[in-house]
Amino acid sequence: MDDETSVKEKQRNSDRISNLPDSLLCQILSDLSTKESVCTSVLSKRWRNLWLHVPVLDLDSNNFPDDDVFVSFVNRFLGSENEQHLERFKLIYEVNEHDASRFKSWINAVIKRRVCHFNVHNEVDDDDELVKMPLSLYSCERLVNLQLYRVALDHPESVSLPCVKIMHLDMVKYDADSTLEILISGCPVLEELTIVRDPNDSLEVVCVRSQSLKSFKIDSERYESQNHVVTIDAPRLEYMNLCDHRSDSFIIHNIGPFAKVDIDVIFNVEYNDPLEPDDSSKIAMLGKFLTGLSTVSEMVISSDTLQVIHDYCKMEQLPQFSNLSRLHAYFEDTWWEMLPTFLESFPNLHSLVMEFDCFPDTEQIDLSYVPQCFLSSLEFVHLKTPYVVNMQKEGRPLTGTSSKRKLAKYFLENGAALKKLTVSASFCNIIDEIKAIPRSSTSCQVVMD
């Protein structure tokens, strides 16, 4: 009897769901993947074609037995008479010029349905075969999120994307330098922009001008071509990540006054060919770049960038970073002599993380000068050696003992505001010595992570 009651209860619940209006059922199905949504068509006649009216199309061609089945499926969905707005469209597919006509008809159909979230991931390998997006993409009035991977963009006469807030352009090729600039300028409420550059793209200038942009990331691997420029004018920018070993010039006209930045750039300066006094144009550009960053509140800086700054400091004085409260810097063992002068540029520094690949086996490092932040603001210091934490387990000696001791002593004896010094596990052989060092701040703790 209990089993019969349970079966009837399940039937009643099933009927309740089936009796819901189409609009609500489609909203429920939109939380499923398209594959799962289609599976509901076998439940009953009521559900047979319901998936065609779901405002989401999320498809990966790799989940289909062959290309013909995939094409037929997409054609059926987009070729239906349904004109309901699409909330999300995601397509993972290998598209080349041979498929261009069919692909563009799909995209035009999606744009006609006023899509909000648009994501095309092209799996083609040949750069010469990248399919061009239709020009209709530049006037999609409801579009909020645009993500493109390995496609080509034609030069537009105009762009009107009034609702786009998020744009990710990954390995995209542009018809001209101005293509990207016009695209960005046509997004008046854009807040998040990510650009991952194709090594073979033809861009010489990446120009980012936006009054609304809050987050900007660029990722560009090293490439032989030179004279590439990145220029940024985004007065509301709150976060910027420059990971670019390709461009040799960075021009910051404007960013937010308390932005957070992550900098890994080399300005086309080779490790074995450092900056020289006669590189006047490069030195001037570096000075303007650093001045453009001088209002930030938090900064992560790579060892490659710090190498260039190390060379720059031999010829010019760093600007004052008066707003900077948090700094995470990756140091090479040969740049320690710049540490006091470097930290003098951060008078209000609150937290410092110094990360090292290794420590030099020497005490011949001058750490006598005490920066202003040691006396008034620096409360937290973390000395990290992430690549040698397991050296003892691997049977390798812990190197740089004397320099580790000297560095820890430098912070403890001079850090009048210091509350905590954290050292990595590679300090384990001298941790007791470090804890015994007299401290300028009586409230300072020494801990090992």
UniProtKB/Swiss-Prot annotation:
Record SUPFAM superfamilies: F-box domain, RNI-like
Entry-linked Gene3D superfamilies: Ribonuclease Inhibitor (3.80.10.10)
Keywords, ordered alphabetically: Leucine-rich repeat, Repeat
Every F-box domain range: 14-60
Domain annotation FBD: ranges: 362-425
UniProt KW Repeat keyword: yes
LRR repeat ranges, renumbered to this chain: 62-93, 123-150, 172-197, 218-244
Tagged with keyword Repeat: yes
PANTHER family in the cross-refs: F-BOX/RNI SUPERFAMILY PROTEIN-RELATED (PTHR31900), PROTEIN WITH RNI-LIKE_FBD-LIKE DOMAIN (PTHR31900:SF33)
Name by which UniProt lists this protein: F-box/FBD/LRR-repeat protein At1g16930
Taxonomic source organism: Arabidopsis thaliana
